[in-house]
Amino acid sequence: MMPSAATVRAIYRCLLRDARELQRTPHFNIRRELKLEQWGVGGFVEPLPVQEETRGTNDPRVLTSLEEFRRLRDDAFRMGSPSIDVDASAKLDEAIETLSELSDQLLLAQCSSVTVTDGVRIEASSKYVQSHSNPASNTYRFTYRVTITNQNEECSIQILGRQYTFESEKGQRVALPRNSPGIVGATPLLAPGQTFEYGSGVDIDAPRGSVTGCLHAVRKTEDDDDGELFDVLVSKFALVAPHTPGNR
């Protein structure tokens, strides 16, 4: 069964809406999905291929789908009636998949932050865990991922501890105090260019909230192995439970 003109038009408009919203999002990049299994787990991350690092909002797959979908829409409605063949129908299926991915990426972008402090880049992202939440008892669980990259060229960075404050829109505050030791039981040493990431989580009493904090680090060089202590900022990032009562 061929898709109707109304279906084509509706999906096309949704694609453009989400794509435009993503393009307005600071520090946008294609992010991997957060998984509950990452909670309490950390490790070093292999560098991405160059083409993956530079995709950003110019993701060839996404932009190609949008451009082809625009052409499909224009061709279908130029004469006032759709003329969608089998190949075009397949393209429509691709557009629907792209729409789903764009929506997921948009929510991830809205729940992320990126900060660079003294050559250390921190990207933090969160995701609502519906399967472990109970809105009826005001329990909303979120998992979050923190990715640490040492962008310095002449020194290593060791993460010694952390401090976080979790706040809900109802005013609840959950504090992880300053100098809480390590991250997921480790004090990773990052050589120049290395990346370490870990996952954790929190329960709050509302479908919306935020996280702010810092990581305690020491800068180490060949001349000074004891190093210089400093804080690496983790900029505020949102906790958002989509499609919950009062949050639509």
Name each model feature, range by range.
Residues 168, 184-195, 238-248:
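Short, surface-exposed linear segments at secondary-structure transitions and domain or protein termini
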Residues 201-248:
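Terminal connector regions
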Residues 1-121, 127-129:
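Intrinsically disordered, low-complexity, basic-enriched segments
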Residues 123, 147, 158, 165, ...:
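Beta-strand cores of modular interaction/reader domains in eukaryotic scaffold and signaling proteins
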Residues 173-208:
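Intrinsically disordered, low-complexity Pro/Gly/Ser/Thr-rich segments with frequent PxxP/GP/PP motifs
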Residues 139-145, 212:
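Short, solvent-exposed loop/turn segments enriched in Ser/Thr/Gly
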Residues 154-174, 217:
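Short acidic, flexible loop segments centered on an aromatic residue
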Residues 128-141, 152-155, 188-192, 204-206:
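Short, solvent-exposed beta-strand/turn "edge" segments of beta-rich domains on protein surfaces
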